[in-house]
Amino acid sequence: VLDALDDEIARLRKAIVDHIDQDPDLRQRRGWLESIPGISTRPSAVVLSHLDAFTRCATAKQWVAYAGLDCAIGQSGTSVRRRAAISKRGSAQLRRALYFPALSALTNNPIIRAFGDRLKGNGKRGKVVLCAAMRKLMHIIFGVLKNQQPFDPNAGLAVS
């Protein structure tokens, strides 16, 4: 049974890649996405599956909120104060697809590495840095797809 499921998963992954390869627009966008250090075939396919939502987002902030990586502050007057966390209101599939690319980007992407080092230097914990890296990766993905150009680390992205 497990072998049959593994075969089906492999067949579906190949079908997804073949579908992207057959459409020139999707193939070009996949190339732009995979030019970002940390993004490979599977995460780019997940991002491409959310293109409809991407076209409705006018700003990178909206795109980040769609993924549920925006900040949710729990505060009720002066009585209840909890630590800020990501809202998780958006696409869990997109967040899940960006988890390992963000880990990879913290070592391989110069912009996200400098950003993560700065946050660690400010005393932020590992998961906080990782969520911030996922958010930064979403901003980079937004810029690459909006500008319709491959990733360029020297293209004026602020390291903040």
Region locations from a protein language model:
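A detector of single, family-specific signature residues
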Residues: 1-160
